[in-house]
Amino acid sequence: MTAAFVTIDPDRCNKDGICAAECPVKILGFPGKGEMPALVKGGEVLCIRCGHCVSVCPTAAIRLEFLTPKDCTPVDTHLLPDEKATRHLLATRRSIRNYKKEPVDKSRLEELVQTASCAPTGHNSRSVQWLIIHDTDEVRRLTAMVADWMRYMIKEQPAMARAFHLEETVAGFDLGLDVICRDAPHIVVACAHKAAPTAAIDCATALAYLEVAAPSMGLGTCWAGFFNIAATFWPPLKEALNLPKGVSNHGAVLVGVPRFRYHRIPPRQAAAITWK
């Protein structure tokens, strides 16, 4: 790294120290109002590449070795939902368990995953990786492997199998009723390398973003808990997924075009809040 890791245009800089105040790891020093911010010694090593400094500067005065203001999308306040719209959006989220048989184009799924990838990650590690199982026949094949795992659990760990109603689930599956993957056309799996310290929460957060974004694209989702557990512990399914070495799955969702439309928002139990 060189001194050019951070470049501040003196003609544009307001010398207000906003960039230094917003830097989460404090690698920008600010002597005081009227002075130019500057990179602290060794700061380039500590930078987590979040882009806060470039994003928050009102005059686009700062650029980094890897990021300039021109690389960024301007914030359009007209596109931001207000408080009422945001609450309505979140309240209308439903777990979709009935899907049309039509497949979703790969380009649409990629767009959805790109949106989900805007989710925050611990220390801005950007640790989340994605596996998209697009082939519906492959989804059916993998679903059958989950059923095999359930049969194993019924035999070897009956108490846990009873707790999760696995016997009933398998019985339904054998009769053609898929309550494992709900006959969804696609599955999206969020993964991360085992070395990532916040891998599990990063993947869960990204999948939450994905399910909130999906309806805007005419898509529905449902968390695939049985699939994710089986993918974690059942060797045949782990082998079939063939994740890169050192990478583990931390969550999965079913994705497809909803068969039905919801018309009302059921009330939710009031939040349990403790004030200190």
Kindly give the residue locations of the regions a language model identified:
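Acidic, surface-exposed loops and disordered segments
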Residues: 1-276
